[in-house]
């Protein structure tokens, strides 16, 4: 019998040049059912080395199953979409332990497998050390795919451990590096489809799978581009308030909640300020970033070019002229407050700015930092960069990096509220007598010591 499988190719996957049918081979990358060691670079590298040694010369012409069976979760009793109530917002305001610098080396090779310890370490790492870790992590993954390509595999099937099942999360092979080799066709299947193929194989039924991946690589322009525009200020036009969101997204959906929603909110806030012809003492600059999903590349590059080197901490003249940066990238929900990034000096200022917005549900300030988006590029060099607290809706449960990230999950009312709040914050920052207070400029990073590691290829 024949049955369809639900899947999607990973970004920068190779193509098939038409339909390809082949037998499957089961070659799991990790020894256990829960590959927690995937998060640790040293362990991942060792697993890839072991995989290459064990499978060299054995996989030609096969469609390779890389993952073990994925247990599909019983549907949770928690709602798939939520809004913050007063209790949840109050929980966010509870004090957390301040970041205590942990011992780390650069380049970082290992992280704790225990989640709390790992999260604590990641919170203390300088942004450049953290992003360097994930870049090298991507390169180790890519070395696996390059090996499989060199072995002549017909394709690779995987699944993903996020979500309750039934949803596709297809991200990257890591092949976006300009010096990367071409990966084979790599597809992510829903857990149900993947498990079905693997069970047939385990029962000795020798299933055959047909895949057809149409992929074109264009290397004529390897650059990403930020989109930047300004509303000129008046008396202090050389000082700048920035707002922004990232323009890139993953491909299995349309990127509606991550992060077309943030771009739409930023653009609408910019339009409001322009249409109302409000007086602006400082210049207002909007930036829609590229390459956020590959490591905040657009915003990190912009900060390095205009404000400061995040390694040496050598500042440029513009560093002293940035009044603040406001980022929108937590889905399509209403704005409920601000993460202060441990900059308690802005609390009384933001409290005053939020007072007329309380009837819109903007009530909460938390001293906590939040991770994973472009305000970190500014915060990393001592600039006031902030991300808003937003109603979760179904962002983390269903749409984040998934095939469900479509227009249907971006409520217009939430986006309009967020745009009004963002416009108000930017207007206040542009006209405040003083610029926003800053945390101290971080110290320069120590010299990076490249490890003497052999390639796993």
Model region roles, listed by residue range:
Residues 119-133, 137, 145, 149, ...:
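Active-site-adjacent substrate-binding region
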Residues 15-50, 174-256, 268-271, 275-281:
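Soluble metallo-hydrolase cores and metallopeptidase-like ectodomains found primarily
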Residues 1-120:
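Noncatalytic luminal/extracellular "stalk/propeptide" segments of secretory-pathway proteins
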Residues 63-67, 154-159, 186-189, 227-230, ...:
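Structural recognition of the beta-strand scaffold that forms the well-ordered cores
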Residues 1-20, 135, 145, 153-178, ...:
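Protein/peptide-recognition domains central to ubiquitin and immune signaling
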Residues 31-33, 70-73, 161-165, 193-194, ...:
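Solvent-exposed loop/turn segments at secondary-structure junctions
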Residues 143, 147, 223-226, 249-349:
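Acidic/histidine-rich catalytic neighborhood of metal-dependent amide-processing enzymes
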Residues 75, 79-112, 159-190, 202, ...:
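Surface-exposed loop and adjacent secondary-structure segments within mature catalytic domains
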